[in-house]
Every structure is written in structure tokens, then in C-alpha cells.
A protein has these predicted regions:
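Class I S-adenosyl-L-methionine-dependent methyltransferase catalytic core
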Residues: 1-177
Length: 177
């Protein structure tokens, strides 16, 4: 796992081979952050939420680029521990890893975020419900951006908050505002 830009640029973290997580590919992540860098000034007091954080690849990228606060929610204990280890290695207090279910977090949090990224397992039965839940719970700040990573089998173009979809190989990102 590689950090693409920011204060931890080019840092690498070895993800254990036995991980069940499917990390966002470097190719997809780099292209996504190229798009985001034109939309978000990460050094402007941004608070972010990384749901279904997996390896924490997006979380460390957000911290590296200057986010003030990143909450990283991951259910799997091994993945959660890896995220904690990465954040300890870079000695940051900008990321709060939480071991828990993404849906329960959405339901219980009172925080609002400038940026939300969700990368649930592509085969998750209720993946299609995530955008509705984010907006029903009011988790985005005004002018906030929510991105959902998903496989080709999902199409969110009819969602009232959908603005665009980007595809990089087998990785799809749907953008919502």
C-alpha cells in the first residue's frame, strides 16, 4: 500500500497477505485523488469519514494530504489493528480508527463531514442502501462530497444526490452531493 501525495508521499506499508480486504488499487486511488484535488482543499480544516476502511489506504492518504480529522470505521479486527499500526507509524493524531460496523456508525453518529468515502465489500447485499442512509442521517456538511466505491453491477444514476460516476478498470466511484 502506497501513499501517493502529501506529507507521507511515497511511504509504503506492507498489507499482510492473508487480509480479506480488497484495497483500492493505486491506479484507481491516484486517479480519484487527481479529481478530488480540483474539488477539495484538504488543508482547509476538512473532516472526513472513511467507511468500510479495509486497509486504511484512503484514510492515510487523507491524513497525508492535510485533513484535520479522519474517522476510519472498520469492522474486521485484523484490518482495524493494521489501520491503528499505520497511524502509529506515521505518528499522527489526525485519524481516529473505530472498530465497528459501518451501518451502525452511520445510524449512531452525530457528526457531519466535508468528505465521506465508503468502500464496502462489492457483494454486500445492502450496498445500494448506503447513499440513502448517508443523506437521511444528514452526515454531509453543506457543499460536502460523498463517494461510494462499488463494482460494475451497481448503478446510482437515478439517485437524487448522484452527480457522476468514474470508472478505473474494475473500480467504480459514484459521486454524490
Amino acid at each position: 500500500m502506497r501513499v501517493i501525495s502529501g506529507i507521507y508521499k511515497r511511504r509504503r506499508f506492507d498489507v499482510p497477505k492473508n487480509f480479506k480486504a480488497r484495497p483500492t488499487t493505486d491506479f484507481a486511488k491516484e486517479n480519484l485523488f487527481n479529481v478530488l484535488s480540483n474539488r477539495i482543499d484538504f488543508e482547509d480544516g476538512i473532516t472526513a469519514l472513511d467507511l468500510f476502511a479495509g486497509t486504511g489506504s484512503i484514510s492515510i492518504e487523507l491524513v497525508s494530504r492535510g485533513c484535520d480529522k479522519v474517522i476510519s470505521v472498520e469492522k474486521d479486527p485484523q484490518h482495524y489493528s493494521f489501520i491503528c499500526k499505520v497511524m502509529q507509524e506515521v505518528k499522527t493524531d489526525k485519524c481516529l480508527p473505530i472498530r465497528g460496523d459501518g451501518f451502525k456508525f452511520i445510524d449512531s453518529t452525530r457528526e457531519k463531514f466535508d468528505f465521506i468515502f465508503a468502500d464496502p465489500p462489492y457483494a454486500l447485499p445492502n450496498l445500494k442502501d448506503i447513499p440513502d442512509l448517508i443523506f437521511e442521517k444528514g452526515l454531509l456538511k453543506e457543499d460536502g462530497l460523498f463517494i461510494l466505491e462499488h463494482g460494475k453491477d451497481h448503478n446510482f444514476e437515478e439517485h437524487p444526490h448522484f452527480v457522476e460516476q468514474r470508472q478505473y478498470g474494475s473500480v467504480n466511484f459514484s459521486f454524490f452531493v
